[in-house]
């Protein structure tokens, strides 16, 4: 989204084979809900990366799919370059309009970190914000969708994706997909 800042997602804790589908969905939600790109650990299957890049090719936009050897280094570099790190967790500060305004009001690039089953302690310490999307067990996919929707105030749902070969025409019933060449 063109907010004057970049918003990227870092997916950590991917377990090969077991998390294939969840990691793909984290990438799909990141793109659809306004993020500019995603960092995936090198352990992520090539098929996940290929799927996300194919979605960008067919459905448009310039969403970046990048890999990282060391998520901690990615976090450190993001902060060194002036960005802030938001870790989504059920243990952090409860999401609120005030907290979203505080994060957004910084005017800095945002790295949103979503983890799997076991998030390393260093992330809680190095994140600028540990944001709880509810204090109950939940999906990182759902947490990311809620956070990005609040961050972009729903505007991401009306965005156009330049270069799209495929687009959906909303309808009460049926599926209307338009192919553009």
Curated annotation (Swiss-Prot):
GO terms for molecular function: tRNA (cytidine(56)-2'-O)-methyltransferase activity. It catalyses: cytidine(56) in tRNA + S-adenosyl-L-methionine = 2'-O-methylcytidine(56) in tRNA + S-adenosyl-L-homocysteine + H(+). Pfam families: Trm56. Keywords: Cytoplasm, Methyltransferase, S-adenosyl-L-methionine, Transferase, tRNA processing. Homodimer. Specifically catalyzes the AdoMet-dependent 2'-O-ribose methylation of cytidine at position 56 in tRNAs. NCBIfam families: PRK03958.1 (NF003048). Belongs to the aTrm56 family. This is tRNA (cytidine(56)-2'-O)-methyltransferase.
């Amino acid at each position: 989204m063109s907010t004057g800042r970049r918003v990227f997602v870092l997916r950590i804790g991917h377990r090969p084979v077991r998390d294939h589908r969840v990691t793909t969905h984290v990438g799909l939600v990141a793109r659809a809900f306004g993020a500019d790109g995603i960092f995936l650990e090198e352990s992520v299957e090539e098929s996940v990366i290929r799927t996300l890049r194919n979605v960008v090719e067919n459905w448009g936009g310039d969403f970046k799919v990048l890999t990282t050897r060391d998520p901690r280094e990615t976090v450190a570099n993001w902060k060194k370059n002036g960005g802030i790190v938001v870790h989504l967790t059920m243990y952090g500060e409860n999401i609120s309009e005030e907290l979203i305004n505080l994060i957004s009001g910084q005017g800095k690039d945002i790295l949103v970190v979503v983890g799997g089953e076991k998030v390393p302690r260093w992330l809680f310490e190095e994140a600028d914000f540990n944001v709880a999307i509810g204090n109950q067990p939940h999906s990182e996919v759902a947490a990311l969708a809620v956070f990005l929707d609040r961050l972009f105030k729903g505007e991401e749902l009306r965005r156009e994706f330049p270069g799209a070969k495929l687009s959906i025409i909303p309808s009460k019933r049926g599926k209307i997909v338009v192919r553009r060449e």
